[in-house]
Amino acid sequence: MFPCRTVIAPETDFLSAAVKADKAGQAISLLKVISAKDLRDVSPEVLNDHLNNSGLPGSEDFYSNVLNPRVANEMITPYKAFFQKEIPATEAEAFRKNPPALVEWCRKEITINNELNSQRIPMSPMGVWKARVADEKSRNIFFVSMARSLGIPAWIDEVTGKIQYRSFNDNDLKNGKVYDVDFEAAQQTQAPTGTLVARY
């Protein structure tokens, strides 16, 4: 006979701490946007970083595009507190008010070298920050991670692969405009929108 042992999942400890910090609702929302596979692998350190450094909901896509630690197929890491510490407050505020400035910063500061990553395993966002050299995919993940750390809703579209963000310029994130990121363009363009009408 083997002795019985209770195994407590990392998210149980995480939720207990969140309840004590009066953040239970946001903690549950965070767990909801993380896939079942990621929940098995994610550490409490990652969960706490993204819960405590994502701000408060301000847009309809806050949970999926700010709070969510997953960007693409990178290893999930606790990067938000790191970026909030590393980026000077005045620069962070400038990026929030003008996200194209963040696009331009990435274009100028991150050197692209796709040949250094022949296995196509994405670098961590913090690794890109420290090295200032990355392949294009790692740079894209880095941009989204940095934007989310600043409270800017950002994502990589699962269908088109486009990097996108919702603009703060409208001061109304519920109706904020979505922009495509183009690191080669001098100016960022608004993503095309339209209405689909289906009759049957």
Annotate each predicted stretch with a short phrase.
Residues 124-127, 131, 161-170:
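Beta-rich nucleic-acid/ligand-interaction surfaces
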Residues 132-140:
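A conserved hydrophobic secondary-structure block that centers on an alpha-helix together
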Residues 1-115, 125-128, 138, 148-149, ...:
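N-terminal accessory/pre-domain segments preceding catalytic cores
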Residues 121:
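Juxtamembrane segments of multi-pass membrane glycosylation machinery
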Residues 151-163:
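Glycine-rich phosphate/pyrophosphate-binding loops
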Residues 118:
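Extracytoplasmic catalytic/substrate-binding loops of multi-pass membrane glycan-assembly enzymes
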